[in-house]
Curated annotation (Swiss-Prot):
Coiled coil: none
PROSITE patterns: THUMP, UPF0020
Protein name: Ribosomal RNA large subunit methyltransferase K/L
Organism: Salmonella gallinarum (strain 287/91 / NCTC 13346)
Annotated ranges, domain THUMP: 43-154
CC annotations in GO: cytoplasm
Keywords assigned: Cytoplasm, Methyltransferase, RNA-binding, rRNA processing, S-adenosyl-L-methionine, Transferase
Record-linked InterPro entries: 23SrRNA_methyltr_KL, DNA_methylase_N6_adenine_CS, RlmKL-like_Mtase, RlmKL-like_Mtase_CS, RlmL_1st, SAM-dep_methyl-trfase, SAM-dependent_MTases_sf, THUMP_dom
Keyword field contains Nucleotide-binding: no
Function: Specifically methylates the guanine in position 2445 (m2G2445) and the guanine in position 2069 (m7G2069) of 23S rRNA.
């Protein structure tokens, strides 16, 4: 009997143990990452040929303590390699693990290689050659602290390499993991199996091979035992012949069918080729089809199973599309696949929540470094009076109500951009803005006391409901997460897409960018203030400080201003402001753009203006500014500088976003200025619930 070890992906150990025991293994002991077992030579070949779950079959050769590189060398030499190698066999060493002595795996591999080669030369035998690409023998050494474990990898290449898959494409899951997913899905061979996002077909091919009793090792051309001195070719050929006989019989007797679809025509062609190479191409129908086109191939029965490894995404901006995909799949399952089972494998349990289905079972497994979950569902048969459940029903109802009221108002006002929802319900703590036929969801980061997974699931529900209520495609919904007004967060670069959208605001056209920054280039709550500036600006010289993207300058220019001067510290936003001005036919010397620290420029400027708009940050401590600024502390000093630039009879419109801001009326009076608060006049219906979004004042000489 040989002591052996079968490695596998974490989470599959118990499943592998059961498989090995069915093959005849004894003394099976589960450890993290695999199973120790015992078996004779025939069992070695059977496990290599028939294990659908093992990554490798390893034959341990010995262990040694490693306190120096000499210890490693001598420990390897203690093994009788001349009785392990066939004459002329090539080999390669795979070394993993480090300690205080062996600090480089390549160095460790070199010491092992030297020890093996020297074992031959000392007996005056031809030295074996190294072949790193396709060796006859693969020696594995694992160094854990001071102990090195030395073993012969009888698999050669990993057992997930079945020999049927085109290796040029991306592989989301290995064949061994795919087989485990099929086994855990609850699917019964002989019943229909469908994968609506099949990619290169791995799940379906593994299922078909299992159902037709086709050994996973049948198509492999290279093994790790070809240079092993104890290899028994007779027994191996018997195991191989038995596998071939069983495969022919299984294929001839199998009567059910498999169905695969994917939106990518190239991967479907690859899936067809893979299935043909696996010898089960006739059993699987592959189609180019989007999930939106998914339908039951057997509406009159029998019932089957839908299985898939849907995309999960790693970028925030991909989530709306993925949530919509899962939500659509859930609805399609309920509408067309009553009586069927569904099994999905995913690295995102939150996305699976968007199905709006209750799982009967779930399993955990690792897909490479990713923690994944497989959830199995039974789809109840639908009845005529069944009503589909609404995702985030309270939120959806409020959004629908707001849309009905605000859409009509916005159309009458001649605006395309407005706030549709602003944390109206505390449990749905987001803002939703419309930009033409686009929508932006801004999630306010939940407090640390809120369970992160629950908050994420709630956000996914919000996205699904928003897509449903607004009736927009997922690629026109943008998701952002922000904390409430923290310093320079609004200027944080998020992406590099550079996609701009032309929107209308009253008589102005403005560029917005919904993806690249936390803010979009247009502060919606200042909409009425901008219109007022346009109405006040005819024949006047207009100054816009802390101008952002210059939208106020556009309104002033369109209102007939004699000149506009737009000042901001950011070159990016000044270039954006210039684009906005040009979009409205405003260019030339009458429309100046100045890149400068606004506070510094204000102290040094000696020009005169009739109308000044200033919307400073609540607080700023930018490295590019000479000093810190606090709007509550410094607004009187700011007004003193502004007064110097204000012509007789001129007006300053002063706005800021500080909650609880208190205007120092006495301080202004000492400067000879009066202030009239116009905050309520500048709040539009879409911001009626948030009356502290900003405060706004008209300031004039007394």
């Amino acid at each position: 009997m040989n002591s052996l070890f079968a490695s596998t992906a974490r989470g599959l150990e118990e499943l592998l143990k059961t498989e090995l025991e069915k093959l005849g293994a004894v003394g099976c002991q589960v450890v993290q990452g695999g199973v120790h077992f015992q078996g004779d030579t025939r069992l070695i070949y059977q496990s290599l040929m028939w294990s659908r779950l093992a990554s490798r079959i390893i034959l341990p050769m010995g262990e040694c303590k490693v306190y120096s590189d000499l210890d490693l060398y001598l420990g390897v030499q203690a093994i009788n390699w001349t009785e392990i190698f066939n004459p002329g066999a090539t080999f390669a060493v795979h070394f993993s693990g480090l300690n205080d002595t062996i600090r480089n795996s390549q160095y460790g591999a070199m010491k092992v290689k030297d020890a093996i080669v020297d074992a031959f030369t000392r007996k005056n035998l031809p030295r074996p050659n190294v072949d790193r690409e396709s060796p006859d023998l693969r020696i594995n050494v694992w160094l854990n602290k001071e102990t090195a474990s030395i073993a012969l990898d009888l698999s050669g290449d990993g057992l997930h390499l079945r020999g049927y898959r085109d290796r040029t494409g991306l592989a989301p899951i290995k064949e061994t993991l795919a087989a485990a997913i099929v086994m855990r899905s609850g699917w019964q061979p002989g019943t229909p199996l469908l994968d609506p996002m099949c990619g290169s077909g791995t799940l379906l091919i593994e299922a078909a091979m299992w159902a037709t009793d086709r050994a996973p090792g049948l198509h492999r051309g290279h093994w790790g035992f070809s240079g092993w001195a104890q290899h028994d070719e007779t027994i191996w050929q018997e195991v191989k012949a038995e596998a071939q006989t069983r495969a022919r019989k299984g294929l001839a007797e199998y009567s059910s069918h498999f169905y695969g679809s994917d939106s990518d025509a190239r991967v479907i062609e690859r899936a067809r080729s893979n299935a043909r190479r696996a010898g089960i191409g006739e059993l699987i129908t592959f189609e180019v089809k989007d999930v939106a086109q998914l339908s039951n191939p057997l509406p009159k029965g029998p019932y089957g199973t839908v299985i898939s490894n849907p995309p999960y995404g790693e970028r925030l901006d991909s989530e709306p599309a993925l949530i919509a995909l899962h939500s659509l799949l859930g609805r399609t399952m309920k509408n067309q696949f009553g009586g069927w089972n569904l099994s999905l494998f995913s690295a995102s349990p939150d996305l699976l929540g968007s199905l709006q289905l209750r799982a009967d079972k779930q399993f955990k497994a690792k897909n490479g470094p990713l923690d994944c979950v497989q959830k199995n569902y039974h789809i109840a048969e639908t009845t005529a009076d069944s009503k589909p459940a609404t995702v985030a029903e309270d939120y959806a109802n409020r959004l629908r109500k707001n849309l009905k009221k605000l859409e009509k108002w916005a159309r009458q006002e001649g605006i395309e951009c407005y706030r549709l929802y602003d944390a109206d319900l505390p449990e749905y703590n987001v803002a939703v803005d419309r930009y033409g036929d686009w929508a932006v969801i801004q999630e306010y980061a939940p407090p640390k006391t809120v369970d992160a997974q629950k908050a994420r699931q709630r956000l996914f529900d919000i996205i699904a409901a928003t897509l449903s209520v607004l009736g927009i495609p997922p690629n026109k919904l943008v998701l952002k997460t922000r904390e409430r007004q923290k310093g320079k967060n609004q200027y944080q670069k998020m992406s590099e897409k550079g996609e701009f959208l032309d929107v209308s605001e009253y008589n102005a056209r403005l560029w917005v960018n919904l993806t690249d920054y936390l803010d979009t280039g247009l502060f919606l709550d200042h909409r009425i203030a901008r219109r007022m500036l346009g109405e006040m600006s005819k024949g006047k010289d207009f100054l816009n400080l802390f101008s952002y993207t210059g939208s106020a300058s556009v309104h002033a220019g369109l209102g007939g201003a004699r000149s506009t001067t737009t000042v901001d510290m950011s070159r990016t936003y000044l270039e954006w402001a210039e684009r906005n001005l040009r979009l409205n036919g405003l260019s030339g010397r009458a429309h100046r753009l100045i890149q400068a620290d606004c506070l510094g420029w204000l102290r040094e400027a000696n020009e005169q203006f009739d109308l000044i708009f200033i919307d400073p940050p609540t607080f700023s401590n930018s490295k590019r500014m000479e000093e810190s600024f606090d709007v509550q502390r410094d607004h009187v000093a700011l007004m003193k500088d502004l007064k110097r630039l204000l012509r007789k009879g001129g007006t300053i419109m002063f706005s800021n976003n500080k909650r609880g801001f208190r205007m120092d009326l006495e301080g202004l009076a000492e400067l000879g200025l009066t202030a009239q608060e116009i905050t309520q006049k500048t709040l539009s219906p879409d911001f009626a619930r948030n009356r502290q979004i900003h405060n706004c004042w008209l300031i004039r000489a007394a």
